[in-house]
């Protein structure tokens, strides 16, 4: 068990290294490299999709549309940048997904289709709202309130986290579906990207990544306690600018 946790921690450390490389590319004004690195990061672990709105808005405003095109040449240049950015983003996806797509085209049955198997493993909605190693977030308070209401109603107390893959069932309060979690996280992300849209910069990108990571930790689905690293580690890159 300890060896398994050690391997997992090293893997997560490697992923944060790729995240920091993408932020370094943004800091050194290399938007295409930034896009390619972040697209590769999404292929390595899809949990980073929570911070994708920050990258999308930054690359859109800092590279594709630094200003509104007002002439034919400016429009042509914007289209050229869009094509380059699209290629830098899509190539990592194609390199990793295309072999599976070709294999799935030869096998259309759901039981053995590799794309269907990937989907069920990447998005395990059956695992429930709270992880066994639950995060101290909004849903922890929600589950605590559910337990209090159950005690007040003198009902049998149900478990809100049954092992690593157990489902979460509330007793008094309504159950929370995955769509609600994603809608809340996306709504918060849309608020956080507004300053980045108005004035795209490296510092604002890092702050936006931090806030999006915090949103995923606070209201995400099946959040592990270590998911706080998605907010805490990027924050370290700009913390000295605000407190020193």
Features from the language model and the residues they span:
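Aromatic/glycine/proline-enriched transmembrane-helix motif characteristic
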Residues: 133-218
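Short acidic/glycine- and proline-prone juxtamembrane loop motifs at membrane-interface regions
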Residues: 8-12, 224-228
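Short, small-residue-biased leader/transition segments that mark boundaries at the very start
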Residues: 2-7
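Hydrophobic alpha-helical membrane-interfacial segments at the cytosolic entry of transmembrane helices
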Residues: 69-101, 122-129
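Hydrophobic/aromatic-rich transmembrane helices and adjacent perimembrane loops
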Residues: 225-244
